[in-house]
From Swiss-Prot:
Interacts with cwf13/snw1. Gene3D superfamilies: Cyclophilin-like (2.40.100.10). This is Peptidyl-prolyl cis-trans isomerase ppi1. Residues 1-154 form the PPIase cyclophilin-type domain. Its EC number is 5.2.1.8. The gene is ppi1. PPIases accelerate the folding of proteins. It catalyzes the cis-trans isomerization of proline imidic peptide bonds in oligopeptides. Pfam families: Pro_isomerase (PF00160). It is an enzyme of class 5 (isomerase). GO terms for biological process: mRNA cis splicing, via spliceosome; mRNA splicing, via spliceosome; protein folding. Belongs to the cyclophilin-type PPIase family. PPIL1 subfamily.
Amino acid sequence: MANVELQTSLGKILIELYTEHAPKTCQNFYTLAKEGYYDGVIFHRVIPDFVIQGGDPTGTGRGGTSIYGDKFDDEIHSDLHHTGAGILSMANAGPNTNSSQFFITLAPTPWLDGKHTIFGRVVSGLSVCKRMGLIRTDSSDRPIEPLKIIKAVAL
């Protein structure tokens, strides 16, 4: 377990997982990808110069489960920071509420440090992420045209 490739409607994004820093989170993401959980799932939230967020099979931003059941605990480390574009973190609704939703940063987002588990980074396909960040959205930051994960491949 080391990488996951997201084959999206705009191109491929290769993600390196930080298995030493966030083993439980990485196992969750990797297993969900391997089992096809993310296949066909949309990026339901896109905010330019901030994040692209996906991983909710309901497409609402309120759904998703983990391989551990409903939610699982954060794995936050003081040596990992949201320093720039391409950081992979868990989306959550507060402390220890991780499930299947994740986001990829499009810029430095230091105010997220200590609040979201960082568990990987984009090693190829950052231009795809940046293009996603330019997609037209509605007033709820939802893309007008769906951005899909066609297939998530555990490598």
